[in-house]
Amino acid sequence: MSNLSLLAARILLALLFIIAGLGKLADVSGFAGYMASGGVPAFLAWPVIALEVLGGLAVLVGFQTRIAALALGGFSVLAGLLFHFDPADQMQMTMLLKNLGLGGGFLLLAQAGAGAYAVDALTGRRAAA
């Protein structure tokens, strides 16, 4: 995989989480209520927002990329299963598949590493497995 491909993948994957996390800051209590409606304790709203924003930023700049990618990938799959698994609702199932696809993309990124255009490359972390 080329370094430009890895950079593009990091940017595209990260933007979703950075924007989504920052958007949740506009109504944290509403987001906490949404989480609670899915059976997830409302007090986890802040850690989820932090994971989305900080994990997204880490992936974007290529810092601790493998860890951040695994965290966001696992989060994507778990959130999809908790909030979007509804076989009676085609849109929710599409959202589930989107989350599963994100999980797959992050798994690939965790395996490939951040590439040369990343903080990890500057600090001597392996760019590829």
Positions of PLM-derived features:
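Extended, low-polarity transmembrane helix blocks
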Residues: M1-A26, G33, A42-A50, L54, ...
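Flexible, solvent-exposed coil segments and beta strand-coil junctions
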Residues: G38-G39
